[in-house]
Amino acid sequence: MNSKYGDNIIDFLRYLEKFVKSLTKDNKIEEFKTFDIKSLLYPRNKDYFGNLSKFLLAVISARIGSNFINEDDIFEISELLKEFLGQELEHLPYLSYEELYVEIVEQVGEINGTVSEIIEAITVTIDFLDTFEKVSQTIDRSNEKQKLLAYLSAPVNQLDNSVSGVFNENDYTDIQRFFTELTNENNQSPDSNISILINDFQSLLNILESQQASSSSSKMIINDSPRTQQRNGTTEQQKKQQQQQYLQKNKEPFYSKDKIMQVSGPSYVFTPSDCNVSIQVGIPPDTLKRDQSICHFIVPHFLISKDVSLSEVEFPIFYNKFVQKGKTKVVIICTVEQKQRIETILCESIFGPAPEHIYTDEEITIPDYKIDLLTERLAIDPRANDEKLDSYVIFKTFDTFGVVDIDLPSASDPTKLINLRIRNTKGLISFHEDYHVVQKQLHLKLQEQQQDQQDKSSSSTTDKQMINTSGNRIILKNNTVSVIDSTIESQYVPVLPFGNDHEQVKKFKAPILGVTFLGVSHGLDFTHCSHTTGFIIWINGSGVVVDPPVGNTTYLQTNGIYGKTVEHIILTHCHADHDSGILQKIIERNKVTLYTTKTINESYMRKLKALTGLPEQSLKNYYTWVPVTIGNKIKILGAEFEFDYSFHVIPTIRFKLEIYNKKISYSADTFYDLQKFKQLKDQGVLSKKRIERLKSFVFDADMIIHESGVAPIHTPMANLLELPSEIRKKIRVVHCSSSVDTKGEIIRPKEGLENTEIIKVDRKYKGVAECIQIQTALNHCSVFSKLSPAEVQRVFFLCKKIWVKRNDVIIKKGSPSDMFYIILSGKVLVYENEYEPIKSTTSVGTVVTDTTTITTTVKTDAIKIPTIKLCAGETLGESALQLDKNIDASATVIAETDVCLLVWKTMDLRTEFHSNLNTFISKVHMDLSHINSCRDAIIRAFQHNITQHINKEEVDSIANGSKDVSFAHHQVIFNEGDTSDSMYIIKQGRVRIHSKKNKNIIRYLNVGDFFGETAYRRSNEDSNFLPTRSFTATAIDPTILLKLDIESIVNPRIQNIIEQKAKKNAEDNIRYHAYSPKIRTPRTPRKVYPIEGLSI
């Protein structure tokens, strides 16, 4: 037998020795004392998983990061490792090493660790798996297989004496029996069987080895005894807070920093050595604003991150096609399935809907008015029918092994090409440079090894290369391989966020009629702080947003404007610079209302379905579509809207509205050219009526919002300057850069709330508008949701509207709670702890009501952190509604900006409802102590995926419609098959979701997790329909749950939030089961391929 391979096996046991010794020396987890190494040699059972969990936990906690595992978390992490990693290990005979490696890395990454630690862990883990794979294949081919296995499991006296301090003879007897059993199982290849033992130990051992140099500086300070904690003056709660702060401070994305650069949002750029061509992973909407030179893009694991598309390739394509005149094509690297989805998106954007998806015949109600959108497209672009998608873009798809090979030009020698292999393993993207060159080098090295098998130095070269058995991957050390985890769903941060060029608005009141421009530029404008065209039309204090730009939601929320203030959307067409921001609005909080034609809505639905991967029915639950027609006017927020199709390359609607004898119009993207219209009329392409409406539809208004751009897709500025002067001065030109020359005759509006243009209406309409605004606030307020219409009317007449100046006190803690408030505009800060500023400087402010002036005083220069921030639509002073009690305020409330409030005095409400006071109190009652105790759990439950910011009023509504239910340790909450009549949020404790029928654990839930989502279906089905539970839920610890009955929450908006969360939970569970190892289809075990040059 070749002694070199015997030495390699001894080295393996030495590594194992080193690993166990390090645990013995450094580990401080009390639970690990019960670890029994011998139990890992037996078949899978309860003891095996328990010890495996402790084993992995010890490695992770001791060597990856520091200060992030608490003693209380040991059991939880152990259970999770049993559930995920343990079950994956059960399927090792059907898994490749690389798949196992990804599973391990995912578990480590979820727990935490620094970037350098995780990258190093990946490198050494792959190194070991590849190396041991070759060793196992060598064993399998050997004629002396039995002898080699016996040598592997030899007693301790046959090995180096240094291992004697780790194992005793009984340990090696067990190991010997284990390997003997391997050889008796039909002489099966040890490839899969040995990997059970090796991967249990060695994959994470390499993580330990990679961090050995820094181990002395990474000592754990967890699991100190109570005596030690007392001595250090640190309580367990303080320690948890410190650990949480550490995690937040040190949380980093997972990528190779030496070769990969993080750029805007969750996207990254890789530049190969000796190459000027970069490759970007992730394509957020503002990619071109950062860099116009990149034309190679890798689509990440998820096409969207949070609420933003990471596959926004439309404008890189348009830039290369129209600005660069087709010098280069965009290269998209993705999976086959992603290619199909992206093709759908691009076809809708570039070519528009197919003929069978155009419904103008049923959308137009005007007699003798015909619009042939396909013919008009050809009139604008005569080559439209000849171009195919491949004239814009090149797709390169990963093969069945997750591999793409590309050649890039060398920077030092343009005549040569650089070989690059890109590998996608379940979202882990790795770049392997000079793959083909190295493959040849490896072949030569293996031949050299075959000539001199006795030369041990050949196995320890510093420039070591490895190839796996299927020949799909080369791993080179010395930073030749770079990796990026594309499964990270980090928060999108635009390159140029809204508000970057102006301060946060200190005072904003939505006007009766006006326009706020969120963006006035286009997708190919790369100048500072340019945003794509979109705007809000304010009507009676509420907003209709037109083509919302990306980032608008964050900007509005920063200034205290949330979904219910702007929950109506008009979509003009399906180009990325007009529809990208709608996704943010759809999932912001409320179920928004979308106004557009059937043709455009179905086109957008096809794009959205391809982007999200969700079925159409699920997407329809996130917004309500209101079809608009050409010829029939519709009412939105009291204004009368009229729509028509513009003259554009894909179906696009324009509109005008009228209210209070004032008109606003919008052209949308269009080509306005009188000479072209005349030419097309002479050719019989456009009818006389069509031309008349194209010439006059938008110009009959008090404010004309008109686009401008490059012909023939857009309207040249010169054409607008030819309009009569009385029209030009009413135009607000958009969709153009700041460099456009308007000759001083046409206004290019400014962006931002502070630049809102107000259209003055007759004084007689102001009272009507104010009544509508108050009534809207009452309708949205969940506190009054149980009142009858007559009672709401009585409440309406009792309110007063007041203004509070910035920094003034609205409510002082400890003062009588005798007023209830609804915020109409502005933001306030709530301080539950005593509000005591450091300095004693005082300022005096005033609160002006319709009839009174109230003087207030507040100390300035405070540094106290507010408990909560509140904005428009939210409520204050709820304790004042307990009309049968006199209660003091529990918090101080300060105006962060100028604030407009609706106010009800307790005394007025008592007087108005004195005859049925108890009935009124029961309808508006809110259990404030219960609500406060529930707040954290509810915010955790609803802040992910469904809504980024669930506000106080919504939290209060959900909490007020819930009740606490308690369960003891191991008590069943509900069983599979039980009637599903309620949903739950975990307020305290933990819950195990499992299937008694299938005898498996589905997942573990913690504080803030939401479950029991099948109950929401009751509100959508026949009253006789009773859904049943699909799993069993059991309390692991003493647990308190918030029980939600959908019938107890009558506000439709709050019901929608809960139902969206329930549907998202159901979709997540489907995905979870789809990737669960329990139901994964087993694959055929891998064939063992011989490695040339290795023999015994």
Swiss-Prot record:
Using the UniProt record, name the top-level EC class of this enzyme in a single word.
hydrolase
Record-level GO cellular component terms? cAMP-dependent protein kinase complex; cytosol
Q: Which cofactor does it need?
A: Mn(2+); Mg(2+); Zn(2+)
Bias category Polar residues: which stretches? 225-236
What Enzyme Commission number(s) appear in the record?
3.1.4.35, 3.1.4.53
What GO annotations for molecular function exist for this entry? 3',5'-cyclic-AMP phosphodiesterase activity; 3',5'-cyclic-GMP phosphodiesterase activity; cAMP binding; cAMP-dependent protein kinase inhibitor activity; cGMP binding; metal ion binding; protein kinase A catalytic subunit binding
Record field: pH dependence: Optimum pH is 7.0.
- Which reaction equation describes what this protein catalyses? 3',5'-cyclic AMP + H2O = AMP + H(+); 3',5'-cyclic GMP + H2O = GMP + H(+)
The similarity comment for this entry is: Belongs to the metallo-beta-lactamase superfamily. cNMP phosphodiesterase family.
Instruction: Quote the protein name from its UniProt record.
Output: cAMP/cGMP-dependent 3',5'-cAMP/cGMP phosphodiesterase B
Species per Swiss-Prot/TrEMBL record: Dictyostelium discoideum
